[in-house]
Structures are given as structure tokens and as C-alpha cells.
């Protein structure tokens, strides 16, 4: 009998073949993803699918929590389905090539946030890289990277694009091109993550920090 090499892939194939399915489904704002038990073939993630399980993605889920969920589901899928595979009770279903999508290796550039992103895209990218490596913005003063680990939509027209502002001494708000987000977890280089009000306490008399546009960045990394 022919040997069939198997692999577990963290998406609902043929969607999101490639190296970063967990991050990419969060960036794209998907409401569900999954895990597939699949045949390994020469083409990347293109083999027959023998079993799969859907994972719902709530809005507050980030990379860390989704990766943990994927790991749990993958272990259970293998434990439950592998015996059936060896008994010849699982049929390998060919993937629909016309529905295939792909995801790439994550680079540092992917994790830098852009003030021109829509609010949804900005929040989704924060989710996709939280807690590690952390999506970041850069300050005008000293080019200091600040990692944004969680944020929410917020409405305060007084906060202009490119301003990271202390509002009412307790709300840390960042102005984007088409609105604002409330920063609920942020991290300075070499420091532990903190909530917005703790960050504001560390700002002292400074109540606005100016943030660089991604396009202004000098690519010298």
C-alpha cells in the first residue's frame, strides 16, 4: 500500500495556504478559520484533505489566544481522526484550486501600523501580532517604537491624525485618518505592557505624543 505523508495546517484549505494562516485570518477580519489534516504533496499545502474542524473567531481574539485554540483543536483532530485514517475510513477530498488563497512569511514591515489604515484594519493588525511580536507605531520624537497590543474603536474628534493623546487623563486615544482608536494595552521598548491610564501617568506634563506616518519612515532597518 502507498504511504501517504500527512500534515496539519492551520486554515480551512484551500484558503490561506502558506506560512502565516493564523496571523492572516486575523488581518483579514475573518469570523472563522480551522484546522485541516491533509496530504503532503510537492505543491505547498495543496494535498487532499482527510479531516477538518472549524474554529470561530470572536472579535476579542488575538494571535496568542487563536494560536492556543488552533493547537488544542489540532491535537484533538489528530487523536480522533488518525485511527480512522489508518483503518481506511477517511476519504481524501481534493482541494478546489479555483478557491485557493495564499499567505506569506511575516516581516517587520507587516507589523508596523499605518495611520492611513481604516479603523477595522488597524485593529485587526493589532490583533494579528498581539502579544508577540507586537504591532507598532513610531514617535516623531526619537523614533521610539511603541507596541500597540490591544485597542478599540473610539469617537473623539479632538484627537487629530497622528496624535497619541491623553483624554480626560485616563483615556489614551490615537488619531487615524478616518477616526480614532482607544489604546487599551501598550508597551514601550524594554518595558512591560501597561494599560492606557498607566501609560498616561508616565507621560508627565506631556499630553500629546506625535506619531510618524509609516511612509515617512526611513527604511534603514
Regions found by a protein language model. Name each.
Residues 97-221:
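Internal anion-binding site segments
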Residues 1-102, 109:
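Donor/substrate-binding cores of folate-linked one-carbon enzymes
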Amino acid at each position: 500500500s502507498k504511504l501517504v505523508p500527512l500534515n496539519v495546517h492551520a486554515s480551512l484549505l484551500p484558503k490561506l495556504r502558506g506560512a502565516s494562516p493564523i496571523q492572516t485570518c486575523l488581518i483579514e477580519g475573518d469570523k472563522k478559520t480551522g484546522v485541516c489534516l491533509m496530504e503532503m504533496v510537492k505543491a505547498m499545502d495543496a494535498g487532499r484533505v482527510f479531516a477538518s474542524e472549524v474554529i470561530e473567531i470572536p472579535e476579542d481574539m488575538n494571535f496568542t489566544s487563536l494560536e492556543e485554540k488552533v493547537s488544542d483543536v489540532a491535537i484533538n483532530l489528530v487523536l480522533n481522526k488518525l485511527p480512522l485514517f489508518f483503518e481506511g475510513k477517511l476519504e481524501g477530498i481534493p482541494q478546489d484550486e479555483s478557491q485557493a488563497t495564499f499567505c506569506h512569511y511575516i516581516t517587520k514591515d507587516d507589523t508596523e501600523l499605518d495611520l492611513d489604515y481604516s479603523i477595522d484594519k488597524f485593529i485587526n493588525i493589532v490583533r494579528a501580532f498581539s502579544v508577540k511580536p507586537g504591532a507598532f507605531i513610531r514617535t516623531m520624537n526619537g523614533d521610539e517604537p511603541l507596541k500597540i497590543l490591544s485597542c478599540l474603536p473610539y469617537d473623539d474628534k479632538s484627537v487629530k491624525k497622528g496624535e497619541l493623546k491623553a483624554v480626560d487623563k485616563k483615556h489614551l486615544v490615537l488619531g487615524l485618518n478616518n477616526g480614532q482608536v482607544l489604546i487599551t494595552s501598550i508597551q514601550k521598548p524594554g518595558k512591560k505592557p501597561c494599560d492606557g491610564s498607566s501609560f498616561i501617568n508616565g507621560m508627565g506634563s506631556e499630553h500629546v505624543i506625535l506619531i510618524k506616518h509609516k511612509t515617512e519612515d526611513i527604511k534603514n532597518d
